[in-house]
Curated annotation (Swiss-Prot):
PANTHER family xref list: 2-PHOSPHO-L-LACTATE GUANYLYLTRANSFERASE
Catalytic activity of the protein: (2S)-2-phospholactate + GTP + H(+) = (2S)-lactyl-2-diphospho-5'-guanosine + diphosphate
Enzyme class name: transferase
Keyword GTP-binding: yes
UniProt name for this protein: 2-phospho-L-lactate guanylyltransferase
Function as written in the Swiss-Prot or TrEMBL entry: Guanylyltransferase that catalyzes the activation of (2S)-2-phospholactate (2-PL) as (2S)-lactyl-2-diphospho-5'-guanosine, via the condensation of 2-PL with GTP. It is involved in the biosynthesis of coenzyme F420, a hydride carrier cofactor.
Species the sequence originates in: Methanocella paludicola (strain DSM 17711 / JCM 13418 / NBRC 101707 / SANAE)
GO terms of biological process kind: F420-0 metabolic process
GO molecular function per UniProt: GTP binding; phospholactate guanylyltransferase activity
Alphabetical list of SUPFAM superfamilies matching this protein: Nucleotide-diphospho-sugar transferases (SSF53448)
Subunit annotation: Homodimer.
Transmembrane segments: none
Keywords of the record: GTP-binding, Nucleotide-binding, Nucleotidyltransferase, Transferase
Xref: InterPro entries: CofC, Nucleotide-diphossugar_trans
């Protein structure tokens, strides 16, 4: 079985630009990808990267200039076996999480992201299904499964729902991460527990002067 991982090769994780430099965002995105592909392979899946530009990586690469939904739906329409679609920014996901999804009796297993999104889908009959990401895609995918006559299971998991999009999301990676992305983040970012909600802040004792995009203060 294959796991398709959409991966943005240019200007990755731009919403983290307030706290991370372009080089840091690029490296973090690559390490999150490494963590996720490692988990997928350990769970017995063959990794396929879906990108908009050629990219050197130890995996099958599918390059498409189409939008995300069109590119994924092209892949699903030609698939002859079950397919997992997993986003490249959920580095907390574990082998057990993936195996639990694969073991579900449902036709489609959907793991929601925060804010109504969809982080992972496991589709047993891909030619009967299509995806519709962006917006409240979790609700859209549940509807699509029903309209297609497919049973759907919601996979409720903190690990799978923790996507790293905003600065505040880095807190979860810093606290709970066990992979290379978390190790990298901890080399220059620390937790700010001084007041209210926990935040991340740049650790000036670990970062050479001039490397960071702003002052060493907690993220907003």
């Amino acid at each position: 079985m294959k796991a398709v991982v959409p991966f943005k090769t240019v200007n990755a994780k731009s919403r983290l630009s307030a706290v991370l430099t372009a080089d840091e965002r690029t490296k973090l995105a690559r390490l999150m990808l490494d963590d996720i592909t490692g988990v997928l392979r350990e769970a017995g899946l063959k990794v396929v990267l879906l990108t908009t530009a050629p990219f050197k990586y130890d995996a099958e690469i599918v390059v498409s200039e189409k939008d995300l939904n069109s590119a994924l739906n092209d892949f699903l329409s030609s698939a002859s076996e079950p397919v997992m679609i997993i986003m490249a920014d959920i580095p907390l996901i574990t082998v057990k999480n993936v195996r639990d999804m694969l073991a579900s009796p449902a036709d489609v297993v959907i793991s929601p992201g925060r804010g109504g999104g969809t982080n992972v889908q496991f589709i047993k009959e891909p030619q009967k299904y299509h995806v519709d990401y962006y917006g409240a895609s979790f609700l859209d995918h549940m509807r699509i499964a029903g309209d297609s006559g497919l049973t759907a299971e919601v996979f409720d998991s903190f690990n799978a729902s923790s996507d790293i999009d905003e600065a505040q999301d880095l807190v979860e990676l810093h606290i709970h991460g066990k992979g290379r992305a978390a190790e990298y983040l901890r080399t220059f970012m620390a937790l700010d527990v001084s007041k209210g909600r926990v935040k991340v802040m740049r650790d000036v004792q670990k970062v050479p002067e001039g490397r960071h995009p702003g002052r060493s203060v907690a993220t907003q």
